[in-house]
């Protein structure tokens, strides 16, 4: 599911337009778009059926209540199912500027992670400023994944680096799938608000998942064949002795 969004700010009014397109190889069902602005969530109506290459659009409006000018994050998601009612989620994160834009001095990096049932997801942060920063971190994932302590606060000393680790669990994500996840970093000074978004991917390990499910077939199969071979040799030896008869 491909998501595109545009944002427009006029004074204290925010308009968000979202368009989702079914780029998969089968139809999607029960499609619903949601927009999360500062924990205020608005949702579209449910579109029962979205054909391949078909698009679905939704527009939402917010009255902004921010006191400080700057850059703020905006979370966009799409819930849908396949023909068998199996649920899926697609997420995206963008931002809007209220008043004047800001350039953050906190930078982060995270690599892609392989996940079977559980994985640790390291996030490396760097403070380029000469002032200590109190940083709020949010990890945004699809609903198929769960995160322990997905919201946290850390203190970054001036011109320093720090690595924090998030624990991610697989709730219902399918083996072989690839999910985009995001880290949102936010902090403020006396007059401005700053935010940055770090995108990365979680890859569901299909080989490990397959082996885990069928490992006893791989382990037990050779053992069973070995036992059958021994029994066959024993019966063959007895058959030869019976044909030869007793020794004189």
What are these language model-derived features?
Residues 63, 80-213:
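Membrane-proximal extracellular "stem/stalk" segments
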Residues 18, 76-78, 183:
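Hydrophobic/tyrosine-rich beta-strand signature of extracellular beta-sandwich/beta-rich modules
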Residues 240-248:
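Cytoplasmic C-terminal tails of single-pass
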Residues 6-12, 112-117:
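Short, solvent-exposed loop/linker segments at the N-terminal edge
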Residues 214-235:
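Selective detector of the "anchor" transmembrane alpha-helix that sits immediately C-terminal
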Residues 1-5, 43-47, 107-110, 149-152:
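Surface-exposed, proline-enriched loop/turn segments that connect beta strands in immunoglobulin-like
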Residues 21-41, 126-145:
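Short acidic, flexible loop segments centered on an aromatic residue
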Residues 8, 48-56, 154-163:
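Short proline/glycine- and polar residue-rich coil/turn motifs
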């Amino acid at each position: 599911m491909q998501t595109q969004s545009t944002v427009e700010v006029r004074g204290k009014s925010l308009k968000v337009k979202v368009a989702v397109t079914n780029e998969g190889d089968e139809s999607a069902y029960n499609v619903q778009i949601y927009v999360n602005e500062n924990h205020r969530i608005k949702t579209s109506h449910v579109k029962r059926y979205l054909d391949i290459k078909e698009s679905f659009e939704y527009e939402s409006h917010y009255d902004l209540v921010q006191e400080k000018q700057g850059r703020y994050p905006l979370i966009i998601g799409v819930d849908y199912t396949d023909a068998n009612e199996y649920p899926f989620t697609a997420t995206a994160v963008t931002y809007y500027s209220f008043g004047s834009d800001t350039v953050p001095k906190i930078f982060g990096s995270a690599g892609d992670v392989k996940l079977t049932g559980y994985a640790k997801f390291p996030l490396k942060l760097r403070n380029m400023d000469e002032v200590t920063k109190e940083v709020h971190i949010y990890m945004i994932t699809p609903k198929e994944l769960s995160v322990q302590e997905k919201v946290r606060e850390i203190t970054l000393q001036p011109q320093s680096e720090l690595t924090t680790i998030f624990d991610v669990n697989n709730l219902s994500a399918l083996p072989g799938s690839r999910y985009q996840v995001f880290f949102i970093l936010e902090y403020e000074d006396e007059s401005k608000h700053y935010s940055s978004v770090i995108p990365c991917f979680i890859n569901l390990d299909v080989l490990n998942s397959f082996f885990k499910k069928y490992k006893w077939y791989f382990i037990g199969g050779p053992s069973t064949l070995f036992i059958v071979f021994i029994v066959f040799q024993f019966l063959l030896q007895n058959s030869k002795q019976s044909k030869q008869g007793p020794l004189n």
